[in-house]
């Protein structure tokens, strides 16, 4: 993939861009195999590759420059702004949206936040696309509600120019830190969730719910989890750290008793909507802390699926799962190092199969799916 910004040295986010893509995959696989070498993996499956460009469904743009000539992209530590509207990681559909948003910022008088001076209102634009429908969710991250009335008043023009904007919101982030979003979210559009679909499973994305940024690879990851679970012929499972329900909804069947747990109420609302649309009667999603939920339950499902943040599931949950002893644990991880550490603490489990999913091309990061079986 050629990137003009990388060539000029103005953006080096894709640290592995000079490395041939097959070599990237080989290096990631070698890294993963090294981490899991102590665990005697029974079967390694081939790496799931990604498209090398235009694969991201989300843009997180720092807004800088002036209200008349805003820049959308990133800030270097020295305060230098780089416009990334032509970043090759984004699909071509993003370009026209960025063009209109720059005009809109000026029309609405949304002064870009100046980090050095601690002045201005508009900090970030967060743009997410639904690959199913070609529609978008747009979030304005503001320092305060000072410009909210101006934003509302100018929205009809924006919606006329960009009818593909399905969800629009304002997030209030008052802290002078490099934090992407605050707690307060104000929905400005009729719709509050962006509709998506992977493998004929409807999914919904609300402004503050997590969603994978590489739809092609995410769909393959969910489908693989579905296929592995189907082979086990089980009838009960937990989906911990479930997000909007991507894994659980793929694995569920009319006979499956599924409980999905996620701390984000926004994400749980999306998961429940999908389950209702699919007509799943034995599926329950709850907004709770996954570790507290699991350690407070007496019943034992046949399979526990975990998809934790980068820190992993942690010692407390590892200890409890080892004691609870479900037949299977399906572990999806965005940080193989924390997963390998957790696997060491999951006593009496062996790794049946492992597959790497290249969710983040041109970087050292990747996703991995591991199926663990309890030793009798």
Curated annotation (Swiss-Prot):
Keywords, comma-separated and alphabetical: 4Fe-4S, Iron, Iron-sulfur, Metal-binding, Methyltransferase, rRNA processing, S-adenosyl-L-methionine, Transferase
Q: What is its EC number?
A: 2.1.1.189
Xref: Pfam families: tRNA_U5-meth_tr
Residues of the active site are 334
Establish whether keyword Membrane is in the entry. Answer: no
UniProt similarity note: Belongs to the class I-like SAM-binding methyltransferase superfamily. RNA M5U methyltransferase family. RlmC subfamily.
PANTHER family in alphabetical order: RNA M5U METHYLTRANSFERASE (PTHR11061), TRNA (URACIL(54)-C(5))-METHYLTRANSFERASE (PTHR11061:SF30)
Looking at the record's lineage, which domain of life comes first? Bacteria
Question: Can you name this protein?
Answer: 23S rRNA (uracil(747)-C(5))-methyltransferase RlmC
Instruction: Name the InterPro entries for this protein.
Output: 23SrRNA_MeTrfase_RlmC, MeTrfase_TrmA_AS, MeTrfase_TrmA_CS, SAM-dependent_MTases_sf, U5_MeTrfase_fam
Q: What is the lineage of its organism?
A: Bacteria, Pseudomonadati, Pseudomonadota, Gammaproteobacteria, Enterobacterales
List the source organism: Pectobacterium carotovorum subsp. carotovorum (strain PC1)
A GO molecular function assigned to this protein is: rRNA (uridine-C5-)-methyltransferase activity
The cross-references to NCBIfam families, in alphabetical order and at most eight, read: meth_trns_rumB
Q: Which GO terms describe its biological process?
A: rRNA base methylation
Known catalysed reaction(s)?
uridine(747) in 23S rRNA + S-adenosyl-L-methionine = 5-methyluridine(747) in 23S rRNA + S-adenosyl-L-homocysteine + H(+)
Its job? Catalyzes the formation of 5-methyl-uridine at position 747 (m5U747) in 23S rRNA.
The positions annotated for binding [4Fe-4S] cluster are 3, 11, 14, 87
Q: Where does S-adenosyl-L-methionine bind?
A: 212, 241, 262, 307
């Amino acid at each position: 993939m050629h990137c003009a910004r990388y060539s000029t040295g103005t953006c080096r986010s894709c640290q592995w861009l000079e490395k041939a893509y097959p070599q990237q995959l080989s290096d990631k696989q070698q890294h993963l195999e090294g981490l899991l070498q102590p665990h005697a993996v029974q079967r390694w499956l081939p790496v799931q590759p990604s498209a090398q460009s235009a694969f991201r469904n989300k843009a997180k743009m720092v807004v800088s420059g002036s209200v008349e000539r805003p820049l959308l992209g990133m800030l270097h530590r020295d305060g230098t702004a780089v416009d990334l509207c032509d970043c090759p990681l984004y699909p071509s559909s993003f370009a026209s949206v960025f063009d209109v948003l720059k005009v809109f910022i000026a029309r609405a008088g949304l002064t870009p936040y100046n980090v050095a001076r601690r002045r201005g209102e508009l900090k970030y634009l967060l743009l997410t696309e639904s690959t199913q429908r070609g529609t978008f969710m747009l979030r304005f991250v503001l320092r305060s509600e000072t410009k909210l009335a101006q934003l509302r008043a100018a929205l009809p023009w924006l919606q006329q120019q960009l009818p593909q904007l399905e969800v629009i919101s304002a997030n209030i982030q008052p802290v002078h830190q490099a934090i992407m979003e605050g707690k307060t979210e104000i929905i400005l559009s009729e719709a509050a969730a962006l509709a998506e679909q992977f493998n004929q499973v409807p999914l919904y994305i609300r402004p503050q719910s997590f969603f994978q940024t590489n739809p092609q690879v995410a769909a393959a990851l969910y489908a693989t989890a579905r296929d592995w679970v189907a082979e086990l012929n089980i009838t009960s499972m937990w989906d911990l750290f479930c997000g909007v329900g991507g894994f659980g909804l793929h694995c569920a069947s009319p006979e499956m008793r599924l409980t999905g747990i996620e701390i984000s109420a926004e994400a749980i609302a999306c998961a429940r909507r999908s389950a209702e649309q699919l007509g799943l009667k034995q599926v329950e999603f709850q907004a709770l802390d996954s570790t507290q939920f699991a350690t407070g339950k007496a019943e034992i499902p046949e399979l526990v699926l975990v998809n934790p943040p980068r820190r992993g599931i942690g010692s407390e949950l590892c200890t409890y799962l080892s004691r609870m002893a479900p037949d299977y644990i399906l572990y999806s991880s965005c940080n193989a190092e924390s997963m390998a550490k957790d696997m060491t603490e999951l006593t009496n489990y062996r790794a049946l199969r492992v597959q790497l999913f290249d969710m983040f091309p041109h970087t050292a990061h990747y996703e991995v799916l591991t199926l663990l079986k309890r030793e009798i």
